[in-house]
Amino acid sequence: MYFLKKIVNLFSSKIESEDNNVKKDDLTQPRKQSPEARKRRNRRIIFWLIILLIIGTIIGVIIYFSVRKEYDNVIVKSAQTEVVNNKKVLYLNTIRPNSTQITRYTIDEDQLLTARVNILNNTNFQIISNASSLGLSRISFNIVREGVEKFKLGETNIYAPISGNTNNQWNWLTSIITQNAGIPSSGFNPQVIISPLISIIFFIIFLYIILRVSKAQSDSLLGTNKANAKLTKSGVRFSDVAGIAEVKEELIEIVDFLKEPKKYVAAGARIPKGVMLYGPPGTGKTLIAKAVAGEANVPFFQTTGSSFEDTFVGVGARRVRELFEKARKSAPAIIFIDEIDSVAKKRGNSLTAVQDQTINQLLSELDGFDTSSGVIVMAATNRLDTLDDAILRPGRFDRQISVNLPDILEREQILRIHSRNKNLSAKVSLEDIARRTAGFSGAQLENVLNEAALLSVRDKATSIHMNHLDEAIDRVIAGPSRPNKVISEREREQVSYHEAGHALIGLYSPGADVVQKITIVARGRAAGYTLQTPERNENILQNKTELISRVRTALGGRAAEELIYGPNEITTGAANDFYKITNIVRAMVASFGMTDVGLTQYIATEGVDNPYRNSYSEQTALAIDIEIEKIIQREYKIVKEMINEHREELELIVQTLLELETILKPQIDYIHQYKQLPPEVIANKNKREASQKQANSSVEEAKVVDDEESIKDKEKDQKSN
């Protein structure tokens, strides 16, 4: 029992160490098992030990009875025959090795024939009979076949009567017994103990492997063995992040706490347990979290909200627990959950309670943090309005930091950071690039420089020039160009009028963005596009005049097509324009309260649980639709009037586009200011007309020569006739 108790304690400590990972008197460690759980675990261990002992005993018994007996070789001292009661008897005087004991064995003539027959048939000879009438002791031999002409002699009570005199057989058996004789061993056979022990050991190993494999398969089926967080050491610093100075200021305090937590604990300060970063995609939320971990030089656990969920119920909550346990052991550390809205949306909207379980576990872990644990949770989302209110309350994600799209100065700083390892030409102006990339995120700006570098390599240039950056911006906005796309001259002209209509309205609408570029080069699914950027720094708020200007600019393309080609020749090129127009006007009517429908917000701009569920009546929906259509038709009429009023300028823009295919702001401003074609367009047009005139004159000269030769040929024919 003492030995069994020791084994139980050994297994208990092993399992407890695996369950609890480490034992420390630390509040950040998981709780110890309850006494009831410990008793249940000990009972399971004792049960399996008893099962193993029973199985080992059964295997040992089977091996004991299946192992052939060992025989000690005996040395035959003499072998002689005598006649006793008219029977021949063989006397064997033998001695064991390493022993002086002499044993006398007897065998009579009656055994010989049967023994001979059984030996030849490869069978054991064992026939019991009564030989007391011979006056001999009840001793005979069991001859067991060991191999060709080799036999062992063992003790049995065997006699075999036989009739007749068989001297030849007698002599044969005498020689065989003399050459090979043996009796059962009286020593200890170690196989009786060793074999069961070996069997038990192999069985335990086999059982361990089976349990491990089955557990791995079960975990794989449940998806619980999938790593849900990457532990890394971040090498990013705040100097690697540009354009978010106010965000850095908010996070410096977090970095200081991770470096010197005792200072804040001693002062009784409660550092925010969670930091929520929200903003548009590509603004650098993940990069900021890495910079915080890099500045504080602490482990960085990175995961996504979707990695917590799986097919089976309870897996998400388990992964949340495991992630926070790992972070506690590595404290001070940072947990970063990207796209947290996929796991922490408002509760009650999901079809099942699986997601609610994960949210509840996440809330519990955030509340369970000790203020001195040294673990900071950072999360990122593009939709703060969809998150559960309990996530954002003080004590969980206390600090909510907005990471917006960079303005022109911040874009220039981002471009400078990403151009550190780029060989830019001295003529490249990053300020100009920043001005032309309004609305670009940090990720898009990095992509612009990378595309420009690839284009420079393709052109075998030693540095990145402005034309490479122009093409890179176009690629990011509309995709790569399609120079090999076959387009008719009429379609090319109609695309020019469409884009010129956008640009013309942008030039004359108050509050409209500045027209930076117009192109009719096909890119992606677009036959052309017009690039506009804000005249001033980007504003967070937009007024009604600016929204109306965006609507008019988008309507300019269709209006120009209809005025030039008629209502029956309009194209599908305005589909995306109408999509933008409808969204802007619908927001003005139903969200911003900018029309006669009223100041009520019928369509929420944030926290929409179900976008297909209306919170207003059918009459209100009809009023909204009527107001939207009224505004669009009113603005469309104004746009057509503006195009008719500035028809001459529209034609100049179209001629320039047909000549150059892509025109930039200086050329657009020249046309708008002087109402004439830019000098380079005139020069290019004159050059093309001159080359065409020269080609036509060459054709005329060739035609004259051909006519003269034909006249001469006719004259020759007439003379010959």
UniProtKB/Swiss-Prot annotation:
Q: Which PROSITE patterns match?
A: AAA (PS00674)
Going by the UniProt record, its keywords in alphabetical order are:
ATP-binding, Cell membrane, Hydrolase, Membrane, Metal-binding, Metalloprotease, Nucleotide-binding, Protease, Transmembrane, Transmembrane helix, Zinc
Instruction: Locate the active site.
Output: E499
Which EC number(s) does the record attach to this protein? 3.4.24.-
Q: What stretches pass through the bilayer?
A: 45-65, 191-211
What positions does the entry give for Zn(2+) binding? H498, H502, D577
Stretches assigned to the Cytoplasmic side: 1-44, 212-721
Question: Which regions face the Extracellular side of the membrane?
Answer: 66-190
> Region (Disordered) spans which residues?
686-721
Q: Identify the cofactor(s).
A: Zn(2+)
Does Acyltransferase show up as a keyword for this record? no
Any one cellular component term from GO for this entry? plasma membrane
Q: Where in the cell is it found?
A: Cell membrane
Q: Establish whether keyword Hydrolase is in the entry.
A: yes
Superkingdom of this entry's organism?
A: Bacteria
Name the top EC class.
Answer: hydrolase
Q: What role is this protein assigned?
A: Acts as a processive, ATP-dependent zinc metallopeptidase for both cytoplasmic and membrane proteins. Plays a role in the quality control of integral membrane proteins.
Name this protein carries in UniProt: ATP-dependent zinc metalloprotease FtsH
Origin organism of this chain?
Ureaplasma parvum serovar 3 (strain ATCC 27815 / 27 / NCTC 11736)
Lineage in the entry? Answer: Bacteria, Bacillati, Mycoplasmatota, Mycoplasmoidales, Mycoplasmoidaceae
